[in-house]
Amino acid sequence: MQQPLYGLIGGKLGHSYSKIIHEKIADYTYELLPLPTEAEARTFMEKRAFAAINVTIPYKQFVIPYCDVVDPKAQAIGAVNTIVNRDGKLYGYNTDYAGFAYLAGAHGVDFAGKTVLILGTGGTHSTVTAVCRDGGAKEILTASRTGKGDALLYSEAMHRPDVQIIVNTTPCGMFPNVGQCLIDPKAFPALEAVLDVVYNPFRTELLLRAEDCGVTAAGGFEMLVAQAVFATEHFTGRQLDTAAIIPAVSRELRHQLANVSIIGMPGCGKSTVGAALAKRLDKKFVDLDAEIERRTGHNIPDIFAQEGEAAFRRYEADVLAEVAKGNSQVIACGGGVIKNPANARALRQNGPVLWVRRPLEALATGGRPLSKGGAALKQLEAERTPLYEAASTVVLENYGTLTAAVDKAVQLFEADERL
């Protein structure tokens, strides 16, 4: 007997976490069903050969005519992201509304009386607008690349100093095109919070800049989990303890998917601790220096000798930018990786940055181009300590045994609520 089909349809789904989220919540198998063209989406919807599906970009409006019944909330928003097949009749819902409302509430973002700037005019824009309007926002502004309709150009939006909350509803900064950003939060002196519906990476460039400004910043992962939990209620017809399930599943999966990036002085034990930590956390281990050697075909001392440090740092930045896009990794970095601020930002996008500290006299410096020991090593430590402090999110004192260091690293990671 053929199993009922549950899954997600969309144009491109390579970045999706929906399968692991749904299968964590419920007991059905959940499939990713990419439909690159409207013709394929049309055929899929006409066949109705599914029990229940979620819908993502670019089909949230496209599927509405195929629904026999559309929930009033979804009808008002003009977007459907959840469809349930009940005896051949398709029922359409929008759980993004509740998901975004959950995200805002979980981070203490209150729209009442606030001026809100929404980036983008796609399907999620209408959902976010509805939540902000229902939350009592004083003014809701929209910005887009074209400035069509009532939307401002992004450059025009930067001249609205009264903006208090920014919400990004565009795919800008989403995997694999990480590092992109439409506006600079520094331009908004009254800014209180930035929310980004992008969930991969955990922290987009927009959110990293918001954190630098000291304002509340939250990505879309909790929204993704919340809307999935609410969708599961429609899929199964069962009411769930959403108040308990959403934060628990969000926390568990963020820890499962997060990278742990390790920085510190040459010879402090980054690779040794990292390899053991990866095994304990069941994550892939990446030694960045080894990866650079693999990709360039040259060992690092030879690169320094033949091409110089500047060339090595370019290789390092390029390799790190690619590696850091992944998830569920422990990444052991070279000692000088923090000399480039862009590297530190890349490491922060998908998890904590662990600074391993070890006494100078205990550092292993053999075969390392820039750490020869003695006075030079002390000078190197003095130069880099402020950079390690700025780049790291947590500190590991590696003064004892490997087992003790790994135990402490696991404890720090599992206790980290800022992933």
Regions found by a protein language model. Name each.
Residues 150-217, 337-343:
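Rossmann-like adenosine-cofactor binding region
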Residues 197-258, 398:
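Adenosine-phosphate binding glycine-rich loop
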Residues 2-107, 201-203, 213-216, 220-225:
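Phosphate/diphosphate ligand-binding glycine-rich loop within oxidoreductases
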